[in-house]
């Protein structure tokens, strides 16, 4: 089958699919100890809370409502309002439901953000995503619709006792310019 360039890019192996295959293999291997991604440290009390909540939703008919009805394009209004209220009350943020975007997870959220702020622009220029600290999460590597979407800088490496080390952003070497579409600061350690 012949795909478009988009299809070719998104049907080949990528960092995130390899990572997710490894996580899936670990979950299916008896006795494996999950020390990486994929929710490695589930909290029994939270699992019990979610099970109870789902049971209540099932008994009240809310599970069918949640699974079988479409929400608005921005997400479920009740959830957006509750999130905005929580962020205002807990953190003092001047935020409303219109400032919140719900996605299918962080991987798709970063895909949208990277391609919204970086890549080829209408004026012919190209902007990039700057990672001020590397190494970075492998799942980002294939998130651009175009190749060479990302740039990064080497960190300062602080050597610590017992063979440990810590990365620090080298603020003096950050290549921030007109071609910087966004700066992505993340430490996805679950």
Which residues fall in each region the model found?
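Conserved core of the PLP fold type I
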Residues: 65-190
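N-terminal "arm"/small-domain region of PLP-dependent enzymes with the aminotransferase-like
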Residues: 1-74, 89, 166-190
């Amino acid at each position: 089958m012949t795909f478009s360039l988009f299809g070719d890019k998104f049907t080949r192996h990528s960092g995130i699919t390899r990572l997710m295959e490894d996580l899936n293999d670990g979950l299916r291997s008896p006795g494996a100890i999950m020390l990486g991604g994929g929710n490695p440290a589930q909290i029994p009390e939270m699992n019990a809370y979610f099970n109870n909540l789902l049971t209540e939703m099932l008994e009240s008919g809310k599970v069918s409502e949640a699974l079988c009805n479409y929400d608005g394009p921005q997400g479920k209004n009740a959830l957006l309002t509750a999130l905005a209220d929580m962020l205002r009350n807990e953190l003092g943020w001047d935020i409303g439901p219109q400032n919140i975007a719900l996605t299918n997870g962080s991987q798709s959220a970063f895909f949208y953000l990277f391609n919204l702020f970086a890549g080829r622009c209408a004026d012919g220029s190209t902007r990039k995503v700057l990672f001020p600290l590397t190494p970075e999460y492998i799942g980002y590597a294939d998130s651009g619709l175009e190749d060479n979407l990302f740039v990064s800088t080497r960190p300062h490496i602080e050597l610590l006792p017992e063979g440990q080390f810590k990365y620090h952003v080298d603020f003096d070497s950050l290549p921030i310019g007109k071609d910087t579409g966004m700066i992505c600061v993340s430490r996805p350690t679950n």
